[in-house]
From Swiss-Prot:
<keyword id="KW-0560">Oxidoreductase</keyword>
<comment type="pathway">
    <text>Amino-acid degradation; L-arginine degradation via AST pathway; L-glutamate and succinate from L-arginine: step 4/5.</text>
</comment>
<dbReference type="GO" id="GO:0019544">
    <property type="term" value="P:arginine catabolic process to glutamate"/>
</dbReference>
<keyword id="KW-0520">NAD</keyword>
<feature type="active site">
    <location>
        <position position="280"/>
    </location>
</feature>
<dbReference type="InterPro" id="IPR017649">
    <property type="entry name" value="SuccinylGlu_semiald_DH_AstD"/>
</dbReference>
<dbReference type="InterPro" id="IPR016163">
    <property type="entry name" value="Ald_DH_C"/>
</dbReference>
<keyword id="KW-0056">Arginine metabolism</keyword>
<feature type="active site">
    <location>
        <position position="246"/>
    </location>
</feature>
<dbReference type="InterPro" id="IPR050740">
    <property type="entry name" value="Aldehyde_DH_Superfamily"/>
</dbReference>
<dbReference type="Pfam" id="PF00171">
    <property type="entry name" value="Aldedh"/>
</dbReference>
<dbReference type="GO" id="GO:0019545">
    <property type="term" value="P:arginine catabolic process to succinate"/>
</dbReference>
<dbReference type="InterPro" id="IPR016160">
    <property type="entry name" value="Ald_DH_CS_CYS"/>
</dbReference>
<dbReference type="InterPro" id="IPR016161">
    <property type="entry name" value="Ald_DH/histidinol_DH"/>
</dbReference>
<dbReference type="InterPro" id="IPR016162">
    <property type="entry name" value="Ald_DH_N"/>
</dbReference>
<dbReference type="InterPro" id="IPR029510">
    <property type="entry name" value="Ald_DH_CS_GLU"/>
</dbReference>
<dbReference type="GO" id="GO:0043824">
    <property type="term" value="F:succinylglutamate-semialdehyde dehydrogenase activity"/>
</dbReference>
Amino acid sequence: MSHLVQLIDGQWLAGEGKPFESMDPAKNEVIWQGGAASASQVDAAVKAARAAFYHWSDLALEDRLAIVRRYADLLGEHKEALALTIARETGKPLWETRTEVAAMQGKIAISIRAHDERTGTVENPMPGAKAFVRHKPHGVVAVFGPYNFPGHLPNGHIVPALIAGNTVVFKPSELTPMVAEAMLKIWQEAGLPKGVLNLVQGEVETGKALAGNPDIDGLFFTGSSRTGHFLHQQFAGQPGKILALEMGGNNPLIVKDVSDVDGAVHAIVQSAFITSGQRCTCSRRLFVERGARGDALVKRLVEVVGQIKVGLYDAADQPFMGAMISEKAALGMVAAQANLQQLGGESLLTLKHLEAGTGFVSPGIIDVTAIGALPDEEYFGPLLQLIRYDDFDAAIDQGNATSFGLSAGLLGDNEADWQHFFKRIRAGIVNWNKPITGASSAAPFGGIGASGNHRASAYYAADYCAYPVASVEDSKAAMPDQLSPGLTF
C-alpha cells in the first residue's frame, strides 16, 4: 500500500482529500489506498507545471527526446512488473496487458516521427523575405486517463505533449491509481525534471478542480461520452484553451456475403468481446442478413462465443476474457441486458455475473431486431446486440442511427460493397474484414459526433499538442523599393 500518491513538483505527497482505494476486480482484494488530491494540491500541481514550462520548452528538442527515449527503454525493462500491475488493477489477462506495455513503448518512436512530420518547421520563399511555419507548445495541459487502458491511452497524450514542450498535470481514472503511480515513477527514473509531469490522484472532485483550473492551457481527455460532454460544457466560452476529446461509441459491424464463416466469426469475437468488451471501439451492434446464410453465421457465432474462456489474469492457461473493471460494471451489464429483454430483445447467449464481489461476467448476445426504438447507448462490456436485416442500405442507415461515430466495419467479400459502405458510414475508424477494435498508432484515432470533437489522437496527437505560428522574416528592417500611395519619407 502507498500513502504518498500525489507527485507535485517532483515530490511524492500524501493526498489531503478523502481517502479512496483500488480493488483487484478478479480477486476482490484491496490493492491500493491513498488520499485524493485536494483543490489546493491540484492548484499546486498546475503552478509547478507552469514554473517548469519555460525550462522544459527551451530545451533543445534532442534533449527532450533523450529523456523520452530513456522512458521507452525503461518501459522495456519494467515490462513484466508493469503488465502485472495493469492486470491486477483492471482484471485484464496478462497476455493482453503485456501487449499494452508494448504499445506504450512503441508509441515513443511513432510520436517522435509524428512530431517531425506534422509540426516541423517549413520555410516558404517570398519576395524580399522568408516565410516560416513553426509550432509552439500550448503551455500547461491537463491529461485525463481512462481505466480500460490505464497505461497506453494516457501515454498517447502525455508523450506527444512532452515532446512538443508542454508540461503536464495527469489525472488518471480513480479505478487505476496504482498503474498511474507506477508510470510516473518510471518517468522519474528516466530523468524527467521536476514539475514537468505532475500526478493528481482522486475521484470526481479532483477532476473538477483540475478541469476548472484557470491556469491550464488545454485538456486532453479519453473516457466516457458523459464526462466528455461535461468537460465540453465546462470549457464553453474559453476559446483560448484547447480541448481534445476521445470518447465512446455505439459501433456498428455489418456482415454481408462472407464466404469464410469462421473468419467472420473470429473478427466479430475480436470486435465485440476482447478486453471483456471494454474498448471504446468495440462493436455494440452486429447486423447480419436474414436468411439461411445469416442463420448459419449466427449459429456458429453463438457456439464460439459460448466457449470463450473467462478467468483470472494470472492463470497458467490464459483466458480470452478477464474480469471487468469492477463488480459495479459487471452488474451494470446484467441490468442493461435485462432492460433490452424487457424492450423485446431475445437473448441467444445470456450474459451472467459469474462470481459475487468480482467483475467476472460471461459474454452475451441478444437479438434486438424486434425492438422498434433501440436505445442509443454504449453498453461498455461484453454484450453484443444482433440486428437482422433485409436491405444493405437500410442496414447502413441503421448503423448511422446513433449520436456516436467512433468505429464501424464491414465483413464481406465484395469490394464494391466495401466502397459503398465506406462512403456512407459515419465514423472516424472504418475497417473492412478486420476487427473494428484494430487501429494503428501510425494513423489518426478518433471519432465524430458524441465520440469526439475532431481532435483525433494517435498519429494526429501532434496536431493538438502544439499550435502553428506563421512568420515573415528578414535580417533587418529596410525601406521598400516602392512606397505605398500616400506615404512620404
